[in-house]
Amino acid sequence: MASSPESAPPTNSTSSPSPPSNTNSTTSSPPAPSPPSPTPPQGDSSSSPPPDSTSPPAPQAPNPPNSSNNSPSPPSQGGGGERGNGGNNGGNDTPPSRGSPPSPPSRSNGDNGGSRSSPPGDTGGSRSDNPPSSGGSSGGGGGGRSNTNTAIIVGVLVGAGLLMIVLIIVCLRRKKKRKDSFYPEPMKGNQYQYYGNNNNNNASQNYPNWHLNSQGQNQQSTGGWGGGGPSPPPPPRMPTSGEDSSMYSGPSRPVLPPPSPALALGFNKSTFTYQELAAATGGFTDANLLGQGGFGYVHKGVLPSGKEVAVKSLKAGSGQGEREFQAEVDIISRVHHRYLVSLVGYCIADGQRMLVYEFVPNKTLEYHLHGKNLPVMEFSTRLRIALGAAKGLAYLHEDCHPRIIHRDIKSANILLDFNFDAMVADFGLAKLTSDNNTHVSTRVMGTFGYLAPEYASSGKLTEKSDVFSYGVMLLELITGKRPVDNSITMDDTLVDWARPLMARALEDGNFNELADARLEGNYNPQEMARMVTCAAASIRHSGRKRPKMSQIVRALEGEVSLDALNEGVKPGHSNVYGSLGASSDYSQTSYNADMKKFRQIALSSQEFPVSDCEGTSSNDSRDMGTKSPTPPK
């Protein structure tokens, strides 16, 4: 009995250091509990002392629960055994396991201990240590991975941006090279005097706009000589030049010498052989003859694709070489507009030159306006035709590069579709059939009654000459009379007859004396006033005083005031039709004398008989004449 009290204090002393180890566990002194942990197994042989020793440490028992409260997982481990001290020891071991430093003691205990109490502490420590350590490592790894992912994303974005910039630069350079190679500067010299006086640099800069604009307009064309845009060329065809657009493809003829810069593009349309056009027109029979005039004969044809065309055979002896002819046709073939007849192709065979146009099925304005036994054309239809023709001419004068002067505006060259929409034909033919050696040709360009005064005096034609001819055509639509009519005296033309009537009508607003009697007053006075004002401004003697075609378009549409065309001069004033000074005014007497002179020259060299064929697209200039003047003595 005496030995038991002596042995009890040592157990208390050995057990007493364990609570301080709990308090010191927070100060990272976990090695203290590890040496006494083997002592309980030594006194494990007697199970009685532990129950006696439970009473003294009772006041210190709350400390382990505090540590166990911080880590609730150890009670579940300690609760698995029946030994209270073993559970406390396990609880004492768990607080050090909360931090990273306690892990080495747990390993040393696992190495030194063979007791039963140490494995729970070790296992508890190992279980509690692993999650924090794994959590710490995973947290560090997650931060590293996020930084790596961010760097990868930034690198990809920067690389993509640089790639896009490089692609844009390459595309811009290729596009610039393509433009430079596809649109060379036009020929220098006087070869393009017919096409306005554009600067070569401006023409080369504006050429792409014209090219793009013409493509868009071609898609809108519906009523041409056979319908919409150009048809695919009939087989067999010559090898193409390989340009990007199938609609602008054509052969490069190897038999020719090296072409000039303007011909380097190749021809835009199709080339036809004489046999192909002969088969299309039935051998150029009279049954397919649409008309004839100063430029030659016009036959209707059908291509193997089923497309209807109008084949115009130009008369021989124009004085132009083959290369020059191709250059001029190349320019004309690029022109596409809703109110212009498009060129489909051409043919050169043993000096014979033919042009292939779209076929317009509803004949000409001349036919419907002056034909016999035909219904009277309504005034609204006349206004629509006048507006369409004005838009087509405005495109030739102001939107084409180089600009194109028609030179032969007249009612016979205004073709109509079944909706009575106007389409201007034969633009550029005056250049194709003129002598290329001199600007002023002995052959009369234009049509009597439509010629501008400056052409009669100087032999030169400009855009304002086309405006004058358009004004004469407006008078035809207003009055229903021809430019040179049998009902008018020989020395008076439609212009001379209408000038005083227009002045009075614009002053008092009464157009009955001027308007076509067949209309019987069925017209809109405001629309009639617009047409009369445009006609009066267009036929002024001075070309400088005539408006542009774009101004006429806006005036006919009612978008601008009519006073803008009068330039501040009252409509009834004589200066509206003349120049500012009497000395510079080209007198009507001189004009009539020059017209007689030109008529004599033209009639003396007449090669084609006057034709009244209804379907012609370009009647001869002399078709409008009523009488032949007395030959000069």
Swiss-Prot record:
Keywords: Abscisic acid signaling pathway, ATP-binding, Cell membrane, Glycoprotein, Kinase, Membrane, Nucleotide-binding, Phosphoprotein, Serine/threonine-protein kinase, Transferase, Transmembrane, Transmembrane helix. Residues 1-151 are extracellular. It is an enzyme of class 2 (transferase). Residues 30-41, 48-65 have a biased composition (Pro residues). The modification Phosphotyrosine is found at residues 357, 455. Residues 284-562 form the Protein kinase domain. This is Proline-rich receptor-like protein kinase PERK4. The lineage of its organism: Eukaryota, Viridiplantae, Streptophyta, Embryophyta, Tracheophyta. The gene is PERK4.
